[in-house]
């Protein structure tokens, strides 16, 4: 199924950015577990700083409601449907580009594939859909935490600017409230907005407390599954496991083992596709967003050369908004791997 | 299924490096197509330079035989079973390490997961299994070629040494026969062997002639599928699509469109997870192999600190042997995506 | 996935009978196809005579709305979400049995499995959910018809009463409007209602115009798939393909072949799991419904022996209401098999 | 995948009756479990009485060998490959019918679908393949038995002859060794062979000791899965769950519940697709085999009317040989359902 992921607990997402609603359907989940709209709402709101501060001005309410699969706040074992209403449908932002293919976007490939041009701001390809992954993924957040697993994301680079490691200690919330006071970041972001430009970014994720033996060779190794799902996030270009193995020889990167544990973790917690109990280290590279308000050469549906300019709201650094999405998808991947391992115990 | 891949035509591989046989089972293939053992054998032999020249001295015959699913050399539509006999079973190479966990290898994680130590030279986790992927994948090679698709792999880096671009014009065979005469490469490889070291490598794959519209958003995007399968290859650490997006802003990497085509291809042929008709550009990073004949600290099954030394044959640059494996898996991925697209025509 | 079916075009259904909504999500469908709520609404309304005439008095509006996956009435290729609001939520009907396990129903097994008792009239196990299968399945109805395929269902037996074959010529609608005038049926149904009883039934489905070569041996034979999906319908107990093979020898049931075609069709259009071009003949047996207003011995959640009496509305012959459900699921199965065959052309 | 079944532990079968070998590949199985060729061989031999006594004279050795996935007789967690060599390849038996489509067989439909005529005695469609299901399924037999589950098959009818219930107490082996002494059966079988005829049969399976809560609504109900797999067996025409619900009203078939348990078991151990702890009751109807040595009208590949006569060995009652196949597939289904339930504990 093209629009589902998860081997045991399966998430299906649906909805277009400028359609009526977006949402997620969770199948294969436990019964008799408390889930509350409040908790999911809180996590969705966590997504907002990443979408609005410095970023796009689009103001969504993202009000989520659970419609099926629960009774008196507990799951029944039946599929759980969550819906988020789209309030902020400013199709007008995008009207002037309706007949143009925005370079770097899905417009051209979606038109060729689906013989169809849904110009309403990206439609199904829009990053708005990722709200569904956050809403559904956070349902597993506590289950993961209760097993001692902590997922933390760090912004390593914005454009060419390397983020000072001392900021890596901050929780992501505090990091963002302090963003304004980190001068270099403030400057680089503002320059971007003023020059109608956007920047690449590198996000690092470290997962602590993960039990060993997760992952299923040969073709469902944990790094295979993680890359499959995380590279489905818009604007991702690259994924890397462990610390940088470029230009290295084996003496430089060997992880020796003592009876007190591993002496290092170059491999980033994964050996032969299975977790070894050490922290997972994953790095993802995001390209700069392609919607800017600068002029850019493209063609329209009649294949005529034109110059395009997006008047809509755009994101100077789209990688930042991806952080809650990455974490949510990781909760889903991890709970699935943990349940899969349980089968054989 | 942990040991299968492919959405329509499915490949299952099996067998251990020091077991009796290894092989592949192909299900969902066309009927009435000629396939010959000779052709598969030829492709398997192409794998040998990558495994023996400069590399491991292990000398496999890799003689393949088709046992089911054909009649008078044509496929019947039933599953096709290919078997390769293991002749070169030198378990003795590995005996002294049987109770030790070789760092960087699957030993430790496989022991934890399967409660079982198959010390016969890596067993199921060994790179030997990749011969099965080559044998099965090449069945689709001609189908892909007949559609005008050409898959080419290039070695970009060995250790810190960047390979001169002029060599990128060589077919891979010619490249390898000339390797000996490329002094820098010769030197770096020999140094490695003499110092019992091994090197990382970067492989670039360029795919020309691929039709647009391949790939299925949101979770079966073509980059998702490719990363899922290619990162299942031993020693892979990173995958990257398109040209380097690090430290960039959008002006530097925009692919403008004219009615004569795209003006550039930074995105490497993929937009929003769907091919756009331009060449696919994929880069994979391999870590240095962990089996060297240098001493390395580890523990044995009784959790006692010891020093380990592999007397077996090892590979100074494991990325090189992966090239035919990458190409074979790509044939399988591409034929599946092409057939999937066919459904909707 | 427990709550999805369909190999290429996948339907997921969700919702409980006395929850807020029920619905279906269609993934993998064509783009650029017209679908309208009116057409789906019409088909849902066709379901009503089967649910209300003679049958349960529960009066649902079954008003369907499409929320995603369309733009200007055409499919975009993205998942299509249909929702049906539950208006007629008379939980009070069921209150007096809330702590009792209704024999023959899902109550007992669902309680054991999900550790949870959703007493709201059957919840997820209720036949109400089948409205989702009708709503989604009819989307494929025209596609099937345009290929010359006609699916027709006939009621062969109600209780012990065999329906006169002459009525098999009627379209189902006409059959039902005439039901009142078919005395034997009228009598048997009324007796049922008066004595608070319910009856078994046998439904025969004949599919004409189906192309040969549909079905995928060995484990996705068309009879395997059909039985898998149709036996998921509530109250089904048996499925049979072809004409009755009981107590037969081979001379009695051989289908000889002439160059003008088959001389008979005992095998009901399927040979070795693949269609042969002849009409498919399928027969399904439904058990009598278990909810009646007669007293029946059972236990409550405290495992105390009690007598139960359902005051809610019940169905004297549940097999009748299944007819549109059977047909809808068959449209889904058939379109999937036809698309699967297309891959190999 | 067309040639695999099983949701967690997956079996893939392959091979043609007159090809080199047949076999099975088991993926997703436990590690560290003892399996021995002897045990599998013993179970395969159990299959022989069902295939040779009274039945076909084809004498296979059915010698099985395990090639991968084990080390020192214990499973490693890697895929397990079992191969059975075909010794008794009398293609000559079938030569005279090579250009004819044997009515009632797969010949015609396989020719249309695969554009290919593998006349070697049924090829992939032959019942010989079922040996693979027996070989793989018996691996799970002990696991099931250790959970207190007993699977027993009974022959209820051969042709029109109803088997006296007193024989239902015999284990199947003893039943068969006594077959010769059960006069009615002896007579009916001999008449068959003399008149070159064959008979239908009804097999009843009763499964005791199965835990409740197995089965996954809505589309992976246990009856759905069982029917899907069992109807893939050659010559099956019908499957029925529970006791006969034909011509019944609800008073006749209600299963009341007391705190001491159910008062009856008309539903045959399944409610709403989930086991309720009572014995499962399944009945399967087999058609008479179509290969007889009587003349029968058919066409050849040139579409010319001819008369066909099979000189090969044929089976007077093909349902009998299916018994070990049914049981093996049930072990596979049950272990999968049990493991699936384990996920949620």
Swiss-Prot record, chains A, B, C, D:
Coiled coil: none annotated. Pfam families: Chorismate_synt. Its EC number is 4.2.3.5. InterPro entries: Chorismate_synth, Chorismate_synth_AroC_sf, Chorismate_synthase_CS. Keywords: Amino-acid biosynthesis, Aromatic amino acid biosynthesis, Lyase. It catalyses: 5-O-(1-carboxyvinyl)-3-phosphoshikimate = chorismate + phosphate. Its cofactor is FMNH2. PANTHER family: CHORISMATE SYNTHASE (PTHR21085:SF0). This is Chorismate synthase.
